[in-house]
Regions:
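Active-site catalytic microenvironments for nucleophilic, acid-base chemistry
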Residues: 41-45, 165-170
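Nuclease catalytic cores
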Residues: 5-51, 84, 230-233
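Short amphipathic alpha-helical segments and their helix-coil junctions
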Residues: 1-6, 10-25, 61-71, 138-142, ...
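Non-catalytic protein-protein interaction segments used by genome-maintenance enzymes to assemble
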Residues: 108-165, 205-208
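Structural motif
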Residues: 2-3, 22-32, 153-155, 220-226
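A non-catalytic, helix-rich entry segment at domain boundaries
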Residues: 38-111
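Metal-dependent nuclease catalytic regions and adjoining charged, substrate-binding loops involved
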Residues: 168-246
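Short, compositionally biased low-complexity segments
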Residues: 6-18, 34, 50-69, 174-186
Length: 246
């Protein structure tokens, strides 16, 4: 059997879990998606050519993505120009963040990973992987452009994101930072929000995913009070109220 982070998220509707923990992902607009794709393309090109990222390179990537796609979205030339100016401000913001400099080198773009959980394969995807060289143990940074309007707490508690972190974990002493990068239309700024997952937390995630995998495989609905009965297993994880990631 193959599972995805969405499968994990959709399955966790146990009534024993704290109320208000469900996260509904807001979809990106076409413009927001193109902003993320332009940054990824520029990062990938720099990685392949072993060159340094700058605003001009992101704008070049933007032009290759944006203008050919505008006709299919019925975006007129004037609107396309205005949005290009807006996008350029986001790209300038990105280049000002530490995440774009040599302390956070990009090692891969559009990456898929998988991990065996019991008799099941958990398959995940992340937009970009960077390494944080500002710390002695070189922490992994997972960069996501696909979600928006999530706080650090939302990121830390979301079952799908936690499953993704687990699949990219390489060792017991590894700390992983999950970073969400999104344009903010209200402030016209590129916003970076993140949560840090330490080794102990990642081990708790493994236990949670293992338990959910068994429920899916055995067709046990954790959202059915009749089937849950007096079971306190979900509550025993405390993974939705643990502050280790914040």
């Amino acid at each position: 059997m193959i599972l995805t982070p969405d499968d994990i998220s959709n399955f966790l509707y146990c009534p024993l879990l704290p109320k208000g923990t469900e996260v509904v992902y807001k979809k990106n607009t076409f413009f927001e998606s193109c902003v993320g794709e332009a940054i990824k393309l520029a990062e990938r090109n720099c990685l392949l050519k072993d060159s340094v990222l700058n605003n001009k390179k992101i704008i070049t990537a933007w032009d290759n993505i944006w203008w050919p796609a505008c006709p299919s979205q019925n975006i007129d030339f004037k609107t396309a120009q205005d949005l290009t100016v807006k996008a350029s401000r986001y790209f300038l913001d990105y280049c000002k963040y530490d995440i774009s400099d040599c302390l956070y080198p990009t090692i891969a773009v559009n990456v898929e990973s998988q991990v065996n959980i019991n008799s099941t394969i958990l398959k995940t995807h992340i937009d970009m992987i960077k390494v944080d060289l500002s710390v002695s143990n070189k922490n992994m940074v997972l960069v996501d452009f696909s979600k928006k309007d999530m706080s650090s707490i939302d990121i830390a508690l979301d079952p799908g994101i936690r499953s993704t972190v687990l699949s990219f974990s390489q060792g017991k002493n590894e700390t992983i930072q999950y970073m969400l990068i999104q344009p903010n239309s209200k402030t016209n700024k590129l916003v970076i929000t993140s949560a840090i997952f330490r080794p102990k937390e990642i081990e708790n995630i493994r236990k949670m995913v293992s338990y959910v995998e068994q429920g899916i495989r055995r067709n046990i609905s954790y959202g059915n009070r009749w089937q849950c009965k007096e079971c306190q297993k979900c509550k025993s994880f405390k993974y939705l109220t643990n502050n280790d990631s914040l």
